[in-house]
């Protein structure tokens, strides 16, 4: 189990962003990453109801090379930049803020600035949860 963790609040533009240390478990291994706590990420898998974490291109490559990882479906997401479809893979768990949840990872082809994953809003304290976009299989 992962205890503690650190939170970073970084100024960027007009607002602030909260970065937490997260541990992503998949297969027989785990990866420690910096993750953005995004109250706007409401992505969930429609079949299971599990949260969907969006991961950077670099982290996506690491996950794709893990034993037993395969594309299990796609998530449709809409942002200011447009609508897009991302492949998803199953994770054994994501630990953040002292809590572990089973989740999916949406594999992005983008590099993120200062973090490697974007957490779904129910995964961290302060997240509101609620309805959102769904992953299709």
Regions found by a protein language model. Give the residues of each.
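Canonical alpha-helical transmembrane segment with a positive-inside/aromatic-interface signature
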Residues: 1-46, 51-53
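Long, low-complexity, charge-dense
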Residues: 136-137
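Cytosolic, positively charged, low-complexity intrinsically disordered regions immediately flanking transmembrane
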Residues: 14-15, 39-62, 66, 73-83
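Aspartyl protease catalytic core from the pepsin/retropepsin fold
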Residues: 22-25, 29-39, 68-132
